[in-house]
Amino acid sequence: MKVAVLFLCGVALAAASPSWEHFKGKYGRQYVDAEEDSYRRVIFEQNQKYIEEFNKKYENGEVTFNLAMNKFGDMTLEEFNAVMKGNIPRRSAPVSVFYPKKETGPQATEVDWRTKGAVTPVKDQGQCGSCWAFSTTGSLEGQHFLKTGSLISLAEQQLVDCSRPYGPQGCNGGWMNDAFDYIKANNGIDTEAAYPYEARDGSCRFDSNSVAATCSGHTNIASGSETGLQQAVRDIGPISVTIDAAHSSFQFYSSGVYYEPSCSPSYLDHAVLAVGYGSEGGQDFWLVKNSWATSWGDAGYIKMSRNRNNNCGIATVASYPLV
């Protein structure tokens, strides 16, 4: 899809590079004509140069994470942000709040809910701003498992199609608390098997006979409190969080502990799931599940900086469902 035009002056387009052909083959890219192919190749090569220069900083010990080419390689940062993000202005409503508790004695230094069976495999939202739906199902899947012992993949597509009266706007964004409100009022959410994901807006096809889980409400973590978020992740389970992911460094993250100095604690545009925490190389991190398939990041996950002044706003808007 051609969504913009680059003005190229004095740029000689060389013969197609092997890396470009490899990228197209790996990700099944087919463009409408040679002009768009050339346009996308310029973007790809610019992104490739950015990755190479960033990784030199990693090799020199200047940064704590590295980057790699992925399926977003032919997209500008503006296109990436427009297509892959999915948060809209929040509605304010009364809700219970989880405040950090004063604790004494040693505390768990690491938590990983994947090892306890509370996390479904990494999913793929496709080119649809439905990250909020995946964060919603992820936290509810975890809470349902912890209550019943059964891990069931829940239907993001139902949230995309059916929850608009409660605030979410399908592929144009939404918020997890509004989705929790919908699930509560609807008396449940179907299994993913019964209501498969399509990565597009559709008509509501909810089937009450396929309900797998429900919730009775939700609780917010005290805004901005990484201590509160840590306690919630440790004691409650996987937690829905929202972050500032509007950076090329996030677009091409590969491994290591992600710290972005230009991140905002209040400009939040992407919903993900905090499934644990730990430390690596002296750097505290949050273990975060994304919804961009396993080809992105560290098999679909990212380690985000913890205890560094709420970097990227990971503790600004965090919540979990009550089951």
Curated annotation (Swiss-Prot):
Indicate the enzyme's highest-level EC class.
hydrolase
Q: Which Pfam families match?
A: Inhibitor_I29, Peptidase_C1
Q: Does the keyword Mitochondrion apply?
A: no
GO-annotated molecular function = cysteine-type peptidase activity
Q: Where is the active site?
A: 131, 270, 290
Show which residues constitute the signal peptide: 1-16
Q: Which residues form the propeptide?
A: 17-107
Record keywords: Protease included?
yes
Name the InterPro entries for this protein: Papain-like_cys_pep_sf, Pept_asp_AS, Pept_cys_AS, Pept_his_AS, Peptidase_C1A, Peptidase_C1A_C, Peptidase_C1A_papain-like, Prot_inhib_I29
Q: Per UniProt, which keywords does this protein have?
A: Disulfide bond, Hydrolase, Protease, Signal, Thiol protease, Zymogen
State the EC number(s).
Answer: 3.4.22.-
Q: List the disulfide bonds.
A: 128-171, 162-204, 263-312
PANTHER family to which the protein is assigned, alphabetical: CYSTEINE PROTEASE FAMILY C1-RELATED
The record's similarity note reads:
Belongs to the peptidase C1 family.
- Provide the protein name: Digestive cysteine proteinase 2
What is the native source organism of this protein? Homarus americanus
